């Protein structure tokens, strides 16, 4: 889909329906805003493509860091978490090759952005070397704590992931007892359409522990996610996990679930799935406004959001600020901007550099536009289209 065609999209060609099975992240996304989930999973244009997410430098860099850290911890976990500097440790580090992995991931993202209809203005803030250095700092700090205060993995056999994948139809508790560890193990609830991929399940002093490593801030929702995964383990294997554990930089959040805890959480899971099915049965689904709206990738399609925006006069915004603005072009645009009218009658002066105007223009008198992430200048009151701004026809 070309940028010219993309920015003229007004609604989906084919509306998304509820998925056959839900994940923890999809349930959370639907609960946050059913319309947002529906719009991001609907099909658009004559070729019925999914709506492309707006790339964000911070999120791309975060994904790269998380991916490499995850590969390092996974590889070292399968080697029973050897000590820093040991032969097994060095062998693992060389195999993962963090520097080359980062370079490959950066190249992959750059290629994707080059062909992305919303890739204008995208630049990573950190170089490949800076990303690698950041990963090494985080990894050294976290790995030392894991080894010193971590799990007893002495009983784990050294194995390749394929050994488990070829036996995934077996009882997971049997596999856990056989190998001592399961990595990225997928489980599906037998009665509720819910699926999860357990990053790390191990035997710690003969106790079953479900573990997840997080590089961000501590969040109670992370333990709740593992509690849902504990339900899957319980229902598939018949065994209640002894412990669930989220490992952060410098901290560990643990919970020791009982059967009663799992039964209560399972009822919540069942209700959430039913609620998600109901919410997605409407086309369009109902929106749920909140702090997430300003970062929503599909807010240009949400009439409720723009209705709320109309209630905030442009002149009431203090200081220089990034704004979303719905306007009607008053006169044909020049190479540097145009005058426009905001719903409600307020006038606005939209300005831009010629290069930016070429991307989203030409702008004709009477056109109805929804502008995302423009810069409202406090000194002049002008609204400037920046390289990261977007302009959609309504």
List each model region and its residues.
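Mg2+/Mn2+-dependent nuclease catalytic core
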Residues: 174-268
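Structural detector for short beta-strands of small beta-barrel domains
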Residues: 314-344, 373
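Beta-strand/loop nucleic-acid-binding surfaces
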Residues: 342-366
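Nuclease catalytic cores
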Residues: 27-77
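Flexible glycine-rich surface loops and low-complexity tracts that mediate binding to linear polymers
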Residues: 325-329, 359-394
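A non-catalytic, helix-rich entry segment at domain boundaries
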Residues: 68-179
């Amino acid at each position: 889909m070309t940028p010219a065609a993309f920015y003229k999209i007004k609604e989906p060609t084919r509306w998304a329906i509820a998925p056959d099975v839900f994940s923890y992240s999809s349930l959370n996304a639907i609960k946050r805003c059913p319309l947002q989930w529906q719009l991001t999973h609907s099909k658009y244009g004559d070729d019925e493509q999914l709506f492309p997410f707006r790339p964000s430098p911070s999120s791309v860099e975060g994904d790269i860091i998380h991916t490499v850290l995850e590969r390092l911890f996974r590889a070292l976990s399968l080697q029973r978490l050897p000590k820093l500097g040991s032969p097994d440790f060095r062998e693992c580090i060389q195999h993962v090759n963090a520097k080359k992995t980062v370079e490959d991931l950066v190249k992959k993202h750059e290629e994707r952005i080059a062909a992305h209809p919303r890739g204008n203005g995208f630049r990573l803030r950190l170089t490949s070397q800076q990303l690698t250095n950041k990963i090494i700092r985080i990894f050294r700090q976290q790995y030392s704590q894991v080894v010193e205060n971590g799990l007893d993995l002495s009983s784990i056999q050294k194995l390749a992931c394929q050994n488990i994948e070829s036996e995934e139809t077996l009882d997971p508790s049997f596999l856990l007892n056989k190998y001592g560890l399961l990595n990225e193990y997928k489980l599906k609830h037998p009665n509720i359409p819910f699926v999860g991929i357990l990053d790390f399940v191990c035997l710690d002093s003969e106790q079953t522990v479900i573990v997840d490593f997080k590089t961000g801030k501590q969040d109670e929702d992370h333990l709740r996610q593992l509690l849902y995964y504990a339900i899957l383990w319980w229902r598939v294997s018949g065994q209640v996990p002894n412990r669930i554990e989220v490992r952060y930089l410098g901290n560990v959040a643990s919970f020791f679930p009982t059967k009663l805890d799992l039964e209560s959480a399972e009822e919540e899971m069942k209700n959430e799935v039913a609620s998600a099915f109901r919410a997605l049965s409407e086309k369009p689904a109902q929106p749920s406004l909140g702090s997430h709206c300003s970062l929503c990738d599909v807010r240009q399609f949400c009439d409720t959001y723009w209705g709320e925006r109309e209630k905030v006069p442009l002149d009431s915004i203090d200081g220089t600020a990034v704004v979303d603005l719905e306007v009607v072009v008053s006169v044909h645009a020049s190479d540097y901007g145009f005058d426009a009218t905001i719903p409600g009658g307020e006038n606005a002066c939209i300005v831009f550099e010629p290069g930016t105007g070429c991307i989203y223009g030409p702008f004709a008198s009477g056109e109805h536009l929804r502008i995302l992430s423009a810069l409202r200048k406090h000194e002049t009151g002008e609204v400037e289209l920046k390289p990261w701004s977007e302009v959609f026809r309504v």
